[in-house]
Amino acid sequence: MGMRKSGAKADAQKSHVLAPGTACVEGARVVVDDEEMEERAESSNIDDSPLIGADNTSADYYFDSYSHFGIHEEMLKDVVRTKTYQNVIYQNTFLFKNKVVLDVGAGTGILSLFCAKAGAKHVYAVECSQMADMAKEIVRTNGYSDVITVLKGKVEEIELPVPHVDVIISEWMGYFLLFENMLNTVLYARDKWLINDGVILPDKALLFLTAIEDAEYKEDKIEFWNNVYGFDMSCIRKQAMAEPLVDTFDPKQIVTSDVLVKKMDISEMASGDVSFTAPFKLIAERDDYIHAFVAYFNVLFTQCHKEISFSTGPRSKGTHWKQTVLYLDEVLTICEGEIIEGSITVEPNKKNPRDLEITINYSLNGKHCQVSLTQHYKMR
């Protein structure tokens, strides 16, 4: 998975573990002067042993990535994300008053703190990363130790001190909505602990697809590999094409309509529903070129007094999720009113279910362009 602009959560979701002092830059040149190199050498007595042994699984890398403070800082500073959850809880205290709440993937414990302040009887905050230790201290510092219990471990492996909970709350969404596959953990918790008429927040999620013109960046990101200082490195181009890019873009780049490709009801869906194939039709809204498909998602809290939602779409206020860009092998020339038809298939990677396999079949039978192609993408 690529990035135009580096971010803490972005780097962690892409690289999982960055050693101290490691530079992680996409499409840029890093220059380290002699003085900085000397400073690094002098600091080599710092314990730089890997956080995870070589025999650990990809799941361990995933959880370790969320031990980094920068990831949580980025998420907390995402005003759209955090204020939406805060508004859901504070404006709908009837959902939490005297209720037992389970916070899945609690991180710093911010959602648990919101729930406790809204009158929850007790909150169980489950966090598998080292951040659980910080969450315990945060809870204690803010005077909620009698209301919030932080449990360190995987949801699938822990046992709650209670047989059931009234509410499950979680911020499980990844890039492209489903990257990292945390939703299945929420569904596991739902099936094991949530009472029959219990509340799950959020309870709906919508995944959309559109198409954009992006000639300038595709040239810089993809076509660059065809001629690198006179050498053919196009084998890397093939890999770059298969790697979705997470970034924002100007809404003026949108060429087609938007189409809903997946609607999820978190209260009722099965874990297998995270894999799906959906047809789509995108209608050109002007004459232009198309260089990429773009995916984004909306999240809904429909069990509130009044439905609350937010969007990660290009026309909405930016979030740390940005959008996911899937570049096309061939540039499409399209005229207003012409239709791109196809299907999108999304499924977890078999070896590492936190990664995503995305396949798009698409065709255009237009005035200037006739194509029928299949492209495969790997989000990791």
Language model features: what each stretch is:
Residues 2-104, 108-380:
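Class I SAM-binding transferase module
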